[in-house]
Amino acid sequence: MSINLRSSGCSSPISATLERRLDSEVQTRANNVSFEQTKEKIRKMLEKVELSVSAYDTSWVAMVPSPSSQNAPLFPQCVKWLLDNQHEDGSWGLDNHDHQSLKKDVLSSTLASILALKKWGIGERQINKGLQFIELNSALVTDETIQKPTGFDIIFPGMIKYARDLNLTIPLGSEVVDDMIRKRDLDLKCDSEKFSKGREAYLAYVLEGTRNLKDWDLIVKYQRKNGSLFDSPATTAAAFTQFGNDGCLRYLCSLLQKFEAAVPSVYPFDQYARLSIIVTLESLGIDRDFKTEIKSILDETYRYWLRGDEEICLDLATCALAFRLLLAHGYDVSYDPLKPFAEESGFSDTLEGYVKNTFSVLELFKAAQSYPHESALKKQCCWTKQYLEMELSSWVKTSVRDKYLKKEVEDALAFPSYASLERSDHRRKILNGSAVENTRVTKTSYRLHNICTSDILKLAVDDFNFCQSIHREEMERLDRWIVENRLQELKFARQKLAYCYFSGAATLFSPELSDARISWAKGGVLTTVVDDFFDVGGSKEELENLIHLVEKWDLNGVPEYSSEHVEIIFSVLRDTILETGDKAFTYQGRNVTHHIVKIWLDLLKSMLREAEWSSDKSTPSLEDYMENAYISFALGPIVLPATYLIGPPLPEKTVDSHQYNQLYKLVSTMGRLLNDIQGFKRESAEGKLNAVSLHMKHERDNRSKEVIIESMKGLAERKREELHKLVLEEKGSVVPRECKEAFLKMSKVLNLFYRKDDGFTSNDLMSLVKSVIYEPVSLQEESLT
């Protein structure tokens, strides 16, 4: 027999002792002016996105001639902005652009700015200063270890050719320049000989670098309703300069009306930016302070989703991110917009696919994991995983650049969503900083201008350590509870409090979920004790005596114990059931103690049945075994009482519903299969019943045990997917979403616990326990800047 741990998700009235502590601590935090100011800053970020100015795009807009005079700029305010916003070192680009991944981007922005000023015969001093910057950094142009902006090999040499047309010499060395132009022209010639939708989109996207696409029909298919091409000011400016399209002009005028003198690298961008902030807050565990703002954003996103808005549907990363977030928050969304990417070929036909945009693939991978039971998204998950693995290996070989994206990919592959626990994820994200890195490089670099990453990180650190201090106090109370109830005297029983509590604290981490965590942990400890009692510690008489006492449930009479062990176990069971029932009453407004008693009685009877099979040396059918084993797996006393303590009302008809019991059966069956697969060798050697050995015996299967185990892993995976689907379903659901998610959280616990070793034995797991419960997070000052 085996035991497991459970998790849930939620809100609640809290036990009196902790409530006083919480009131004090929360008031202390509320009085912390800096803490409240940080939260207010984040609320403003969510209300309005401010994207950084792009010197590169502003330069191309500045180069647009007036329709009334080719010798004058249409947008002189952009030219003036370039004159006024050169950096001290002679460059143009993002502030604080010293990061290695931005070096070529800065060169590109600087050259574009020089061209804009040269075109209009203005700013000789700035031009010379910019040329000096390019000369000093000329070695970076050919350095293959530095990240290239999208289209750099086409656009940068294209700008050099344009500089020649303007009688401007770029100080890069004739051999370097000639080689770059030769490679560019060869690339364009090769591209023209092979057709693909992705290539066509790419050539349209880098239009300012080609300057020789004469067929508007090849370009117009990428024009959006707002008049832009790809929502890119630079591409749209180049298109208007070449083709004089009214839609392009309308877009450019609207940009300058909104931003006055300098434009961003992409517009509109609000949807992706705001969704990415939500993901950042969730990945750091601080989203619960911004529920109102998050709901408002997602409501708006859902409206855009339903009407197929271009800002969402035409941007692959935004579409995947919106799908994942809307689904996770209970919105009814179809995966149809992602269907084209079920196969890698669908991705290859896009601009993102042609330029091998790893960031977009990562978003597709995460989206596919959020809806794993659909065959199309299973395929998507498969190819995106392989793609990311290959990309990761190539990064290692070439020691490439974007450390934040690399870390995100590593984490996504190492910690799949079905086996990751929130608080462990939060800690990891806080420490590596990837969750708050908001600089991206496409054709040029951009960042969310009004996001202060140090503020967000400090808030996350404060919250993590605050919650952890509560968790440590709860662990101390549980340690005392074990001693007070003499559980340490039961030498046959494994002492697994740390694991039992961790599984709840890592998922039900919010301070207000204290009662649910305590119930969860006590359920885990007691099911472990009872499991060991039925397995090795008790005689048949003792087992039957314990069942009789629970079945009788006489709180007024004097219990008759057959042994001291039975007395210890029944006493703590009785007190814990009554305590949980009393707490549940404050949440539910009704007596649920009888249901908790039944949960325990069902477990004890299932364990007795297994004990009888073992003592009789009888072999049940696989069907009979599994029908009993999902109960004996012992999740019932862990997760089911906790659902009463999460917050939402659970009427008796809901608890008796098929949906509620199916949630329990699916997660328990999955856990039992995972346990039996991992414990097959040990349990076979001990002569214990096991799903794998029973399958081999009854099915008279000629396949190897390895093949059978793989088959059973597939069955466990299908149960996990069925559970996930049931949790996500909103139409006709009778179980509140918060309660359903408790079962999903337990599924994640089980998949994590059984990834390597048999249940409680992993050293890695103990490391996780310590990091979540005992080790405060601290950051070096440089991590906060």
UniProtKB/Swiss-Prot annotation:
Transit peptide (first-last residue): 1-29
Subcellular localization: Plastid, Chloroplast
Reactions the enzyme catalyzes: ent-copalyl diphosphate = ent-kaur-16-ene + diphosphate
Keyword Transit peptide: yes
Amino-acid positions noted as binding Mg(2+) 2 in the UniProt annotation, renumbered to this chain: 531, 535
Pathway linked to the protein: Plant hormone biosynthesis; gibberellin biosynthesis; Secondary metabolite biosynthesis; terpenoid biosynthesis
Disruption phenotype: Gibberellin-deficient dwarf plants.
EC number(s) given by UniProt: 4.2.3.19
Record key words, sorted: Chloroplast, Lyase, Magnesium, Metal-binding, Plastid, Transit peptide
Coiled-coil positions: none
Binding site for Mg(2+) 3: 675, 683
GO cellular component: chloroplast; chloroplast stroma
Domain notes: The Asp-Asp-Xaa-Xaa-Asp/Glu (DDXXD/E) motif is important for the catalytic activity, presumably through binding to Mg(2+).
PANTHER family the UniProt entry points to: ENT-COPALYL DIPHOSPHATE SYNTHASE, CHLOROPLASTIC, ENT-KAUR-16-ENE SYNTHASE, CHLOROPLASTIC
Family per similarity comment: Belongs to the terpene synthase family. Tpse subfamily.
Protein name: Ent-kaur-16-ene synthase, chloroplastic
Organism of provenance: Arabidopsis thaliana (Mouse-ear cress)
Gene name in the database record: GA2
